[in-house]
């Protein structure tokens, strides 16, 4: 799993603007729609109740920068170009926009999402299905290397959303197994990657088969000229949303992963670690409030002194718990991402990601604190089979290598 992490593509806003000016000349002002509203909570976005339930159940508590600016314009039916590194929560941005606008009483394909690889398409399908869990959404991934007949059967039985790779999607449209008549949203994810893999012609071919009035969303880490060309051809007055990466570093923090075969075995792994290590103070991150309570009970029943905070507690209670943790009267704090940015505790030498974060950018906010004030720190990530993709994405996003936990971990703390 660990191995050299690929270089993250850096984004240069000046270069982008220069290319835009070259391509659009004086039309640039008219080409974009300006949209400056920022929503700092999901509740403020006017989303359906059952979509909000899905978002919170998935483990999101507070929208990331791109979600704060990108979900609402997409929900309003505007064309959007969103430029952000992978891992900034862009998948959930367009999934929320799509799920908000579907007519669930019509079991026809209303949204088509294209991705460059099979793995990414399947990952998007998973997120779409999880966020739409309480809405009863029907999603299907059309990707190469799977049974054509099975695809045809599922499409004919009716789905709301198709996520897929260009080759298989075009094939399904050509065979008329995927009927485009009701498609009203078209999303290109990792557009730069799709174009660099030579899918340009196929994307154009697919677009020709879609209804003329369609909402288009383009999501990409970089904007090569070909991507701009696509935006010109397919989009009308798109909203441009640009999110830069945080300038926080992971320097001085040693990062490891532990393979855990099953979710149920994480607890044993955690207790083993606490028995073998002399830890001054540590923070354990999980993805849901319910899990905070569950893990706190389990740890206490095994005689570990732990405190816990999460978003359901009132501010006063959270402040008291944080004071106790800072003063050292409790050594282990169990919490969720909501509080990741606010834990300024100098003695924290170890951060454990009991659950990997749901988006790579939160990884930094979680573990970036264990090396605060120049102190060295250690981060240990529990990784099940289902987490391997996220671990890879985190390594790619930060251009780091996360090694397997060595036997002599006690010497590092």
Curated annotation (Swiss-Prot):
Annotated S-S bridges: none
Keyword annotations of the record: ATP-binding, Helicase, Hydrolase, Initiation factor, Nucleotide-binding, Protein biosynthesis, RNA-binding
GO MF terms, alphabetically ordered: ATP binding; ATP hydrolysis activity; RNA binding; RNA helicase activity; translation initiation factor activity
Pfam families recorded: DEAD (PF00270), Helicase_C (PF00271)
InterPro entries the record matches: DEAD/DEAH_box_helicase_dom, Helicase_ATP-bd, Helicase_C-like, P-loop_NTPase, RNA-helicase_DEAD-box_CS, RNA_helicase_DEAD_Q_motif
Domain Helicase ATP-binding, residue spans: 71-241
Keyword Cell membrane: no
Top-rank lineage group of the source organism: Eukaryota
Top-level EC class as recorded in UniProt: hydrolase
EC number(s) from the headed UniProt entry: 3.6.4.13
PROSITE patterns: DEAD_ATP_HELICASE (PS00039), HELICASE_ATP_BIND_1 (PS51192), HELICASE_CTER (PS51194), Q_MOTIF (PS51195)
Helicase C-terminal domain boundaries: 252-413
Record's GO cellular component terms: cytoplasmic stress granule
Sites where the protein binds ATP: 84-91
Reaction catalyzed: ATP + H2O = ADP + phosphate + H(+)
Assembly description: eIF4F is a multi-subunit complex, the composition of which varies with external and internal environmental conditions. It is composed of at least EIF4A, EIF4E and EIF4G.
Family according to the record: Belongs to the DEAD box helicase family. eIF4A subfamily.
Protein name stated in the entry: Eukaryotic initiation factor 4A-14
Organism from which the protein derives: Nicotiana tabacum
